[in-house]
Protein backbone atom coordinates (compact mmCIF):
# COMPACT_ATOMS: atom_id res chain seq x y z
CA UNK A 1 0.00 0.00 0.00
CA UNK A 2 1.16 3.50 -0.85
CA UNK A 3 -1.04 6.50 -0.17
CA UNK A 4 -1.80 9.29 -2.61
CA UNK A 5 -0.42 12.50 -1.13
CA UNK A 6 -1.17 15.08 -3.82
CA UNK A 7 -3.33 15.48 -6.92
CA UNK A 8 -2.98 18.55 -9.12
CA UNK A 9 -4.69 19.51 -12.38
CA UNK A 10 -3.95 22.26 -14.88
CA UNK A 11 -5.35 23.54 -18.15
CA UNK A 12 -3.25 22.62 -21.21
CA UNK A 13 -3.79 22.59 -24.99
CA UNK A 14 -4.62 19.67 -27.26
CA UNK A 15 -3.62 19.08 -30.89
CA UNK A 16 -6.35 21.41 -32.17
CA UNK A 17 -5.31 24.27 -29.91
CA UNK A 18 -8.28 23.71 -27.62
CA UNK A 19 -7.91 23.50 -23.84
CA UNK A 20 -7.75 20.12 -22.15
CA UNK A 21 -6.99 18.76 -18.69
CA UNK A 22 -3.65 17.49 -17.40
CA UNK A 23 -3.47 15.77 -14.01
CA UNK A 24 -0.51 14.84 -11.82
CA UNK A 25 -0.65 12.33 -8.96
CA UNK A 26 2.03 11.95 -6.26
CA UNK A 27 2.40 9.18 -3.66
CA UNK A 28 4.05 8.96 -0.25
CA UNK A 29 6.78 6.66 -1.54
CA UNK A 30 7.80 8.82 -4.48
CA UNK A 31 5.48 7.55 -7.19
CA UNK A 32 4.54 10.10 -9.84
CA UNK A 33 2.04 9.93 -12.66
CA UNK A 34 0.88 12.41 -15.27
CA UNK A 35 -1.98 12.07 -17.75
CA UNK A 36 -3.40 14.33 -20.45
CA UNK A 37 -7.01 13.98 -21.56
CA UNK A 38 -8.07 13.85 -25.25
CA UNK A 39 -11.19 15.34 -26.87
CA UNK A 40 -13.43 14.25 -29.75
CA UNK A 41 -14.95 16.14 -32.69
CA UNK A 42 -17.63 13.69 -33.81
CA UNK A 43 -19.00 12.74 -30.42
CA UNK A 44 -21.74 10.25 -29.63
CA UNK A 45 -24.75 11.78 -27.88
CA UNK A 46 -24.54 9.08 -25.20
CA UNK A 47 -20.89 9.75 -24.29
CA UNK A 48 -19.80 10.81 -20.83
CA UNK A 49 -19.85 14.60 -20.58
CA UNK A 50 -16.74 16.61 -21.33
CA UNK A 51 -17.04 19.66 -19.09
CA UNK A 52 -16.33 23.00 -20.80
CA UNK A 53 -16.54 26.45 -19.21
CA UNK A 54 -18.76 28.14 -21.78
CA UNK A 55 -17.03 31.47 -21.11
CA UNK A 56 -16.84 33.06 -24.58
CA UNK A 57 -14.14 35.46 -23.39
CA UNK A 58 -11.69 32.55 -23.00
CA UNK A 59 -10.82 30.07 -25.75
CA UNK A 60 -14.17 30.69 -27.48
CA UNK A 61 -15.97 29.11 -24.57
CA UNK A 62 -13.92 25.91 -24.64
CA UNK A 63 -11.88 26.48 -21.49
CA UNK A 64 -11.71 23.70 -18.91
CA UNK A 65 -11.09 25.65 -15.71
CA UNK A 66 -14.26 24.18 -14.19
CA UNK A 67 -12.97 20.65 -14.76
CA UNK A 68 -9.56 21.64 -13.39
CA UNK A 69 -11.19 23.13 -10.29
CA UNK A 70 -13.26 19.98 -9.85
CA UNK A 71 -10.04 17.97 -9.67
CA UNK A 72 -8.20 20.34 -7.36
CA UNK A 73 -11.08 21.32 -5.08
CA UNK A 74 -13.41 18.31 -5.06
CA UNK A 75 -11.69 15.12 -6.18
CA UNK A 76 -8.22 15.70 -4.70
CA UNK A 77 -9.33 16.24 -1.07
CA UNK A 78 -11.39 13.04 -1.22
CA UNK A 79 -8.66 10.85 -2.74
CA UNK A 80 -5.73 12.00 -0.60
CA UNK A 81 -4.87 8.99 1.54
CA UNK A 82 -6.26 6.43 -0.91
CA UNK A 83 -4.07 3.47 -1.85
CA UNK A 84 -2.69 4.31 -5.30
CA UNK A 85 -2.74 0.60 -6.17
CA UNK A 86 -6.50 0.33 -5.63
CA UNK A 87 -7.65 1.56 -9.03
CA UNK A 88 -11.16 0.20 -8.53
CA UNK A 89 -11.64 2.16 -5.30
CA UNK A 90 -10.19 5.35 -6.80
CA UNK A 91 -12.49 5.21 -9.81
CA UNK A 92 -15.53 4.17 -7.77
CA UNK A 93 -15.06 7.11 -5.41
CA UNK A 94 -14.96 9.59 -8.30
CA UNK A 95 -18.09 8.06 -9.82
CA UNK A 96 -19.78 8.39 -6.42
CA UNK A 97 -18.65 12.01 -6.06
CA UNK A 98 -20.06 12.84 -9.48
CA UNK A 99 -23.36 11.09 -8.85
CA UNK A 100 -24.68 11.37 -12.41
CA UNK A 101 -25.02 8.60 -15.04
CA UNK A 102 -22.83 10.48 -17.54
CA UNK A 103 -20.31 12.27 -15.30
CA UNK A 104 -21.95 15.61 -16.05
CA UNK A 105 -21.27 17.12 -12.63
CA UNK A 106 -17.48 16.79 -12.35
CA UNK A 107 -16.79 16.12 -16.03
CA UNK A 108 -15.38 12.99 -17.64
CA UNK A 109 -12.30 15.04 -18.56
CA UNK A 110 -11.65 15.70 -14.86
CA UNK A 111 -12.33 12.14 -13.71
CA UNK A 112 -10.37 10.45 -16.51
CA UNK A 113 -7.29 12.60 -15.92
CA UNK A 114 -7.14 11.46 -12.30
CA UNK A 115 -7.90 7.83 -13.19
CA UNK A 116 -5.06 7.59 -15.71
CA UNK A 117 -2.57 9.63 -13.67
CA UNK A 118 -3.16 7.38 -10.65
CA UNK A 119 -2.34 4.30 -12.74
CA UNK A 120 0.83 5.96 -14.02
CA UNK A 121 1.86 6.82 -10.45
CA UNK A 122 1.27 3.25 -9.28
CA UNK A 123 3.32 1.84 -12.16
CA UNK A 124 6.08 4.37 -11.50
CA UNK A 125 6.27 3.46 -7.83
CA UNK A 126 6.67 -0.22 -8.67
CA UNK A 127 9.20 0.50 -11.41
CA UNK A 128 6.99 -1.22 -13.97
CA UNK A 129 5.98 -0.20 -17.49
CA UNK A 130 2.34 0.88 -17.49
CA UNK A 131 1.27 -1.99 -19.76
CA UNK A 132 2.72 -4.53 -17.31
CA UNK A 133 1.15 -2.84 -14.29
CA UNK A 134 -2.27 -2.79 -15.97
CA UNK A 135 -2.11 -6.15 -17.72
CA UNK A 136 0.28 -8.40 -15.82
CA UNK A 137 2.84 -10.84 -17.20
CA UNK A 138 0.60 -11.94 -20.08
CA UNK A 139 0.36 -8.46 -21.63
CA UNK A 140 2.31 -9.14 -24.82
CA UNK A 141 0.18 -8.61 -27.94
CA UNK A 142 1.07 -5.58 -30.06
CA UNK A 143 -2.02 -4.19 -31.76
CA UNK A 144 -2.66 -4.21 -35.49
CA UNK A 145 -2.89 -0.50 -36.36
CA UNK A 146 -5.70 1.16 -38.26
CA UNK A 147 -3.95 4.10 -39.91
CA UNK A 148 -6.18 6.95 -40.99
CA UNK A 149 -4.53 8.23 -44.17
CA UNK A 150 -7.46 10.05 -45.80
CA UNK A 151 -9.54 12.29 -43.53
CA UNK A 152 -13.04 13.51 -44.32
CA UNK A 153 -16.26 14.34 -42.50
CA UNK A 154 -15.82 16.24 -39.24
CA UNK A 155 -12.06 15.72 -39.29
CA UNK A 156 -11.32 17.74 -42.43
CA UNK A 157 -12.45 20.74 -44.43
CA UNK A 158 -13.18 18.90 -47.66
CA UNK A 159 -16.07 17.33 -49.58
CA UNK A 160 -15.51 13.71 -48.50
CA UNK A 161 -18.50 12.45 -46.49
CA UNK A 162 -16.95 9.44 -44.80
CA UNK A 163 -14.75 10.49 -41.89
CA UNK A 164 -11.81 8.10 -42.13
CA UNK A 165 -10.24 5.86 -44.73
CA UNK A 166 -7.65 3.65 -43.11
CA UNK A 167 -5.07 1.02 -43.94
CA UNK A 168 -4.29 -2.04 -41.83
CA UNK A 169 -0.90 -3.72 -42.49
CA UNK A 170 -2.11 -7.17 -41.45
CA UNK A 171 0.56 -9.03 -43.41
CA UNK A 172 3.48 -7.71 -41.35
CA UNK A 173 5.37 -10.13 -39.07
CA UNK A 174 5.91 -7.55 -36.30
CA UNK A 175 4.52 -4.21 -35.19
CA UNK A 176 7.74 -2.51 -36.25
CA UNK A 177 7.32 -3.82 -39.79
CA UNK A 178 3.62 -2.93 -39.78
CA UNK A 179 4.52 0.65 -38.91
CA UNK A 180 7.09 0.76 -41.71
CA UNK A 181 4.57 -0.57 -44.22
CA UNK A 182 2.02 2.02 -43.15
CA UNK A 183 4.53 4.86 -43.40
CA UNK A 184 5.59 3.77 -46.87
CA UNK A 185 1.98 3.64 -48.08
CA UNK A 186 1.36 7.06 -46.52
CA UNK A 187 4.27 8.58 -48.45
CA UNK A 188 3.19 6.79 -51.63
CA UNK A 189 -0.29 8.25 -51.21
CA UNK A 190 1.14 11.75 -51.03
CA UNK A 191 2.87 11.09 -54.33
CA UNK A 192 -0.34 9.74 -55.89
CA UNK A 193 -2.39 12.72 -54.74
CA UNK A 194 0.26 15.20 -55.89
CA UNK A 195 0.30 13.51 -59.28
CA UNK A 196 -3.45 14.06 -59.52
CA UNK A 197 -2.99 17.75 -58.71
CA UNK A 198 -4.75 17.33 -55.36
CA UNK A 199 -4.13 19.02 -52.03
CA UNK A 200 -1.81 17.14 -49.65
CA UNK A 201 -2.58 19.18 -46.53
CA UNK A 202 -3.50 17.01 -43.56
CA UNK A 203 -6.57 16.86 -41.32
CA UNK A 204 -6.98 16.59 -37.55
CA UNK A 205 -5.61 13.06 -37.40
CA UNK A 206 -2.70 13.53 -39.77
CA UNK A 207 -4.25 12.01 -42.88
CA UNK A 208 -4.54 13.80 -46.20
CA UNK A 209 -7.73 15.77 -46.79
CA UNK A 210 -8.16 16.27 -50.54
CA UNK A 211 -11.39 17.06 -52.36
CA UNK A 212 -12.36 13.90 -54.23
CA UNK A 213 -15.09 12.96 -56.71
CA UNK A 214 -16.62 10.44 -54.34
CA UNK A 215 -16.06 8.36 -51.23
CA UNK A 216 -15.20 5.47 -53.53
CA UNK A 217 -12.38 7.49 -55.10
CA UNK A 218 -10.75 7.69 -51.66
CA UNK A 219 -10.61 3.89 -51.73
CA UNK A 220 -9.15 3.68 -55.22
CA UNK A 221 -6.38 6.21 -54.59
CA UNK A 222 -5.37 4.34 -51.42
CA UNK A 223 -5.26 1.06 -53.34
CA UNK A 224 -3.02 2.74 -55.90
CA UNK A 225 -0.75 3.95 -53.09
CA UNK A 226 -0.54 0.46 -51.56
CA UNK A 227 0.59 -0.98 -54.88
CA UNK A 228 2.95 1.94 -55.50
CA UNK A 229 4.60 1.16 -52.14
CA UNK A 230 5.15 -2.42 -53.30
CA UNK A 231 2.42 -4.17 -51.31
CA UNK A 232 -0.60 -6.26 -52.24
CA UNK A 233 -4.06 -4.97 -51.29
CA UNK A 234 -6.10 -7.67 -49.63
CA UNK A 235 -3.02 -9.61 -48.62
CA UNK A 236 -0.37 -7.35 -47.11
CA UNK A 237 -2.68 -4.42 -46.43
CA UNK A 238 -6.46 -4.22 -45.98
CA UNK A 239 -8.73 -1.19 -45.85
CA UNK A 240 -10.97 0.08 -43.05
CA UNK A 241 -13.49 2.91 -42.92
CA UNK A 242 -14.95 5.01 -40.14
CA UNK A 243 -18.09 6.27 -41.81
CA UNK A 244 -19.30 8.26 -38.77
CA UNK A 245 -22.73 8.19 -40.39
CA UNK A 246 -24.40 10.01 -37.49
CA UNK A 247 -22.67 13.11 -38.85
CA UNK A 248 -24.67 13.01 -42.11
CA UNK A 249 -27.90 11.40 -40.92
CA UNK A 250 -30.95 13.65 -41.26
CA UNK A 251 -33.30 12.86 -38.37
CA UNK A 252 -36.15 14.77 -39.98
CA UNK A 253 -36.18 12.62 -43.12
CA UNK A 254 -34.60 9.44 -41.78
CA UNK A 255 -32.13 9.50 -44.65
CA UNK A 256 -28.36 9.63 -44.98
CA UNK A 257 -27.29 12.74 -46.88
CA UNK A 258 -24.02 12.20 -48.76
CA UNK A 259 -23.59 15.86 -49.66
CA UNK A 260 -20.23 15.33 -51.36
CA UNK A 261 -21.86 12.95 -53.83
CA UNK A 262 -25.29 14.59 -53.97
CA UNK A 263 -26.99 11.40 -52.76
CA UNK A 264 -29.81 10.87 -50.28
CA UNK A 265 -30.01 7.24 -49.16
CA UNK A 266 -32.40 5.22 -47.05
CA UNK A 267 -30.91 2.89 -44.46
CA UNK A 268 -31.42 -0.11 -46.75
CA UNK A 269 -29.78 1.71 -49.66
CA UNK A 270 -26.80 2.69 -47.50
CA UNK A 271 -26.37 -0.91 -46.31
CA UNK A 272 -26.49 -2.10 -49.93
CA UNK A 273 -23.84 0.49 -50.78
CA UNK A 274 -21.53 -0.89 -48.09
CA UNK A 275 -22.13 -4.44 -49.31
CA UNK A 276 -21.16 -3.40 -52.85
CA UNK A 277 -17.97 -1.74 -51.61
CA UNK A 278 -17.03 -4.80 -49.55
CA UNK A 279 -17.57 -7.10 -52.54
CA UNK A 280 -15.51 -4.83 -54.77
CA UNK A 281 -12.62 -3.82 -52.49
CA UNK A 282 -10.52 -5.41 -49.69
CA UNK A 283 -12.41 -3.69 -46.86
CA UNK A 284 -12.10 -5.54 -43.57
CA UNK A 285 -13.63 -3.08 -41.09
CA UNK A 286 -16.47 -0.53 -41.08
CA UNK A 287 -17.12 1.71 -38.09
CA UNK A 288 -20.46 3.38 -37.30
CA UNK A 289 -22.03 2.37 -40.59
CA UNK A 290 -25.43 3.64 -39.43
CA UNK A 291 -26.59 6.41 -37.12
CA UNK A 292 -26.02 5.77 -33.42
CA UNK A 293 -29.78 5.52 -32.82
CA UNK A 294 -30.56 3.55 -36.00
CA UNK A 295 -30.32 0.15 -34.31
CA UNK A 296 -32.53 -1.44 -36.97
CA UNK A 297 -30.03 -0.24 -39.56
CA UNK A 298 -27.11 -1.66 -37.60
CA UNK A 299 -28.96 -4.98 -37.32
CA UNK A 300 -29.58 -5.01 -41.08
CA UNK A 301 -25.91 -4.25 -41.72
CA UNK A 302 -24.74 -6.93 -39.29
CA UNK A 303 -27.00 -9.57 -40.80
CA UNK A 304 -25.85 -8.69 -44.31
CA UNK A 305 -22.06 -8.47 -43.98
CA UNK A 306 -21.19 -9.05 -40.31
CA UNK A 307 -19.86 -12.54 -41.03
CA UNK A 308 -17.05 -11.20 -43.21
CA UNK A 309 -16.47 -7.60 -42.10
CA UNK A 310 -15.60 -6.18 -38.69
CA UNK A 311 -18.47 -3.84 -37.78
CA UNK A 312 -17.25 -1.47 -35.08
CA UNK A 313 -19.56 0.40 -32.73
CA UNK A 314 -18.20 3.78 -31.66
CA UNK A 315 -21.06 6.27 -31.29
CA UNK A 316 -23.22 3.14 -31.17
CA UNK A 317 -21.69 1.78 -27.93
CA UNK A 318 -19.66 4.75 -26.55
CA UNK A 319 -17.42 2.38 -24.52
CA UNK A 320 -20.42 1.76 -22.29
CA UNK A 321 -21.12 -1.74 -20.97
CA UNK A 322 -24.89 -1.23 -20.83
CA UNK A 323 -24.96 -0.14 -24.48
CA UNK A 324 -22.63 -2.97 -25.45
CA UNK A 325 -24.69 -5.55 -23.56
CA UNK A 326 -27.78 -4.42 -25.47
CA UNK A 327 -25.90 -4.73 -28.76
CA UNK A 328 -24.65 -8.21 -27.90
CA UNK A 329 -28.16 -9.33 -26.95
CA UNK A 330 -29.63 -8.01 -30.22
CA UNK A 331 -26.79 -9.31 -32.40
CA UNK A 332 -25.70 -5.86 -33.51
CA UNK A 333 -22.15 -5.20 -34.74
CA UNK A 334 -19.25 -7.49 -33.80
CA UNK A 335 -16.69 -5.05 -32.43
CA UNK A 336 -16.46 -2.09 -30.06
CA UNK A 337 -14.29 1.00 -30.30
CA UNK A 338 -12.66 1.76 -26.97
CA UNK A 339 -12.20 5.45 -26.12
CA UNK A 340 -11.22 6.11 -22.54
CA UNK A 341 -12.85 9.55 -22.44
CA UNK A 342 -16.20 8.24 -23.69
CA UNK A 343 -16.73 6.48 -20.38
CA UNK A 344 -14.28 8.35 -18.11
CA UNK A 345 -12.38 5.81 -15.98
CA UNK A 346 -9.87 3.03 -16.55
CA UNK A 347 -11.94 0.45 -14.67
CA UNK A 348 -15.01 1.07 -16.82
CA UNK A 349 -12.82 0.97 -19.93
CA UNK A 350 -11.38 -2.40 -18.95
CA UNK A 351 -14.88 -3.68 -18.12
CA UNK A 352 -16.01 -2.84 -21.67
CA UNK A 353 -13.05 -4.63 -23.24
CA UNK A 354 -13.63 -7.71 -21.08
CA UNK A 355 -17.34 -7.83 -21.91
CA UNK A 356 -16.59 -7.54 -25.63
CA UNK A 357 -14.07 -10.36 -25.61
CA UNK A 358 -16.34 -12.69 -23.63
CA UNK A 359 -19.05 -12.16 -26.25
CA UNK A 360 -16.68 -12.83 -29.15
CA UNK A 361 -16.55 -9.17 -30.15
CA UNK A 362 -13.22 -7.56 -31.00
CA UNK A 363 -12.04 -4.40 -29.23
CA UNK A 364 -10.24 -1.54 -30.98
CA UNK A 365 -8.46 0.87 -28.62
CA UNK A 366 -8.74 4.38 -30.03
CA UNK A 367 -7.47 7.94 -29.81
CA UNK A 368 -9.65 11.03 -30.32
CA UNK A 369 -9.33 13.65 -33.02
CA UNK A 370 -8.19 16.17 -30.41
CA UNK A 371 -5.12 14.48 -28.96
CA UNK A 372 -2.02 15.23 -26.90
CA UNK A 373 1.45 13.77 -26.44
CA UNK A 374 -0.02 11.34 -23.88
CA UNK A 375 0.48 7.73 -25.04
CA UNK A 376 -1.52 5.89 -22.37
CA UNK A 377 -3.74 4.20 -24.96
CA UNK A 378 -0.71 2.41 -26.42
CA UNK A 379 -0.11 0.76 -23.05
CA UNK A 380 -3.82 -0.01 -22.65
CA UNK A 381 -3.88 -1.78 -26.02
CA UNK A 382 -1.01 -4.06 -24.98
CA UNK A 383 -2.19 -4.46 -21.37
CA UNK A 384 -5.53 -5.85 -22.53
CA UNK A 385 -4.14 -7.77 -25.54
CA UNK A 386 -6.85 -5.91 -27.46
CA UNK A 387 -5.24 -6.75 -30.79
CA UNK A 388 -6.11 -3.52 -32.59
CA UNK A 389 -5.42 0.19 -32.19
CA UNK A 390 -6.66 3.23 -34.05
CA UNK A 391 -4.44 6.23 -33.48
CA UNK A 392 -4.28 8.26 -36.64
CA UNK A 393 -1.98 8.70 -39.58
CA UNK A 394 1.78 8.70 -40.03
CA UNK A 395 2.18 12.42 -39.34
CA UNK A 396 1.57 14.83 -36.43
CA UNK A 397 3.47 14.15 -33.24
CA UNK A 398 0.27 13.65 -31.24
CA UNK A 399 -0.36 10.53 -33.38
CA UNK A 400 3.24 9.38 -33.73
CA UNK A 401 3.69 9.47 -29.93
CA UNK A 402 1.45 6.41 -29.64
CA UNK A 403 3.25 4.52 -32.41
CA UNK A 404 6.63 5.30 -30.88
CA UNK A 405 5.45 4.05 -27.49
CA UNK A 406 4.36 0.79 -29.12
CA UNK A 407 7.82 0.46 -30.68
CA UNK A 408 9.34 0.86 -27.21
CA UNK A 409 6.96 -1.72 -25.76
CA UNK A 410 7.78 -4.20 -28.53
CA UNK A 411 11.47 -3.75 -27.74
CA UNK A 412 10.87 -4.21 -24.00
CA UNK A 413 8.87 -7.39 -24.59
CA UNK A 414 11.58 -8.84 -26.81
CA UNK A 415 10.99 -12.41 -27.96
CA UNK A 416 7.63 -12.74 -26.19
CA UNK A 417 6.09 -9.90 -28.21
CA UNK A 418 3.25 -11.00 -30.50
CA UNK A 419 1.79 -9.31 -33.57
CA UNK A 420 -1.33 -11.11 -34.75
CA UNK A 421 -2.07 -9.15 -37.92
CA UNK A 422 -4.98 -10.78 -39.74
CA UNK A 423 -5.57 -13.09 -36.75
CA UNK A 424 -6.73 -10.02 -34.81
CA UNK A 425 -10.02 -10.40 -36.69
CA UNK A 426 -10.78 -13.70 -35.00
CA UNK A 427 -14.55 -13.51 -35.33
CA UNK A 428 -14.72 -13.21 -39.12
CA UNK A 429 -15.14 -16.00 -41.64
CA UNK A 430 -13.49 -14.14 -44.51
Swiss-Prot record:
SUPFAM superfamilies: Enolase C-terminal domain-like (SSF51604), Enolase N-terminal domain-like (SSF54826). Catalyzes the reversible conversion of 2-phosphoglycerate (2-PG) into phosphoenolpyruvate (PEP). It is essential for the degradation of carbohydrates via glycolysis. It comes from Exiguobacterium sp. (strain ATCC BAA-1283 / AT1b). PROSITE patterns: ENOLASE. Its cofactor is Mg(2+). GO terms for cellular component: cell surface; extracellular region; phosphopyruvate hydratase complex. Pfam families: Enolase_C, Enolase_N. InterPro entries: Enolase, Enolase-like_C_sf, Enolase-like_N, Enolase_C, Enolase_CS, Enolase_N. The active site is at residues 205, 339. Mg(2+) binds at residues 242, 287, 314. Its EC number is 4.2.1.11. Belongs to the enolase family. It is found in: Cytoplasm; Secreted; Cell surface. Disulfide bonds: none annotated. CDD domains: enolase. Coiled coil: none annotated. This is Enolase. The gene is eno.
Amino acid sequence: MSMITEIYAREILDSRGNPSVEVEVFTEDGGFGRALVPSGASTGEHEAVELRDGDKSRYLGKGVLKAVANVNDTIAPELIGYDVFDQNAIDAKMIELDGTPNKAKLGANAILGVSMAAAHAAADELGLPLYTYLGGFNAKTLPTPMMNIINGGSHADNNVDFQEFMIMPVGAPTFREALRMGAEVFHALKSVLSGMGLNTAVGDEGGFAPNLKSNEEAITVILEAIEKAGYKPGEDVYLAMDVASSEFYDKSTGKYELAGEGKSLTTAELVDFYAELVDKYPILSIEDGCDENDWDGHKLLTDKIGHKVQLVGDDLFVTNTSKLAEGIEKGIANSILIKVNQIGTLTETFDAIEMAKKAGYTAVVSHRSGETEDATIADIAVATNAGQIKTGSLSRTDRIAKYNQLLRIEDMLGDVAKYDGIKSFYNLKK
